[in-house]
Structures are given as structure tokens and as C-alpha cells.
């Protein structure tokens, strides 16, 4: 039995679902026998069986949903927004019990209220995780729905805190969190790639340049997290008068580096809001 004394079922196991599943196993929150998975791809189920020793697996829509609800306390919705309505139509008539069950939704752009229309009495907690959970350095936002209690929210918050950092927030802040920590890893990867490309242009081997870039980003992040100093102050400490760093900073400012990053964060939030409206209009 898991540390939490509960069993968990995943409906869908894409990249993010796998990251969470892998993280829960690594943190020993659940054992393989505590985990149930429904995925439409048999190849995906075989992968989970071979790599994580999970045996409670099914791709049969007519049986798998009831199987998960009957056996699990926590049900994780890890599917595309486009198929959510179909899944909810399947699972709404399963044997749900408000005192036993809780739903965790990691579906981008879908508010808890949408799920609650189909399962009005079942606690729903929305979570926005990110892919660095694969290496236990994730960052998550956790927002309880209308039917979720403080205890439900605290439980989910603790589960995701085991995979990195987790913030318990009101749902109105979830899209903003998504724009930073959900989308942000892609921007960081782009920066690492660009730094490595710059090193290659200057004559460094690709592997060396990429490792130096990634290590530098990781080191800078740890400096921000482990000191009480503002990032701007830390930047100033690297910039010697008339030196190479301040010359590079000037080049970044000429390219509107900070403003562009802020625009990317804003664009991510706007797109999340658009997705929510699209799904609402379609349903």
C-alpha cells in the first residue's frame, strides 16, 4: 500500500501524465501495484508495464473507466481537452462516492467547473504541473474546485510538493502559473540552445557548449532560489565596469530580451484563456 494509503488511477498517460506517475513512484508516494492506468494505446500500456512494472492496465473504454473508479481513491485526468467531454460522458455513470473519491485534473485550459457539471458532488482539484517533474524539480500550481475541501487541497498540494515546489492558489491564478512554469521550460530550453549555438560559433564543441550553457542556467537558478538577493542584484555582481558581461547585457537589451520574455508569458496566458473559451463554446 502507498504512503498515502490510497490507490490512484490515470486516465491517459501522455508525457505529463508519465512525468507525474514517474515522480510519484520515485517519491514512493505510490507503489506500482497502487497504480491503475487507462490509455487507448496498447503500445503505451506495454511501455508502462515494462518500465514501471504496472500491471493494472486497460485500453477498453467500456470496462477501464469503471475498473479505475471501482478500485481507486484518486483519479487523474491526463488527457487532451478535445476528448474530455467524451471521457466525462463515460465516467459520469460510474460508481462514484463523494466520501472516497477525488479527481485531479491536469488538463490545460479546463476549469474545475466544467468537470463538476458532470460530477457535481465529487471533489475536483486542478493542477498545472511541468515536465521537469521527470527529474523531481517540478513546479506546480494547485487549485481546489467548488466541491473540494481544504483537506483535499492539502493532500494534492503535498503530493506535488514531493515532485518539486507546489503553490496552493485560487483557480483564477492557474492560467498565470501555466504561462510561467508550464510554458517556461520551453523558453529555458530555447535559451540553452541559443547559448550553445553561440559557443559553437565561437569554436567550442557542441557537447561542451551545451553542457556549459545548461549548467550555467541551473547554477543561476539555484543562486536565485538559495540566496535572498534579487535577480537584478545578482546580475549586477557579474557585470564588471567595461567588461564582457555588461557588453552582452547591452546586446540583450538592444534585442528587447526582457520585454520579449514578458510578452511570451502574456501570450501563454492569453492562449490558455482562449482554449477555455473554445472548449466552453464547443460543449
Which residues fall in each region the model found?
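Small-residue helix-packing motif on alpha-helices
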Residues: 35, 45, 68, 205-212, ...
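Short acidic capping loops at alpha-helix termini that bridge into adjacent secondary structure
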Residues: 31-35, 98-100, 207
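NAD(P)+-binding Rossmann beta1-loop-alpha1 motif at the extreme N-terminus of oxidoreductases
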Residues: 1-70, 200-201
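Conserved short alpha-helix immediately C-terminal to the canonical SAM/SAH-binding motif I
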Residues: 41-44, 83, 195
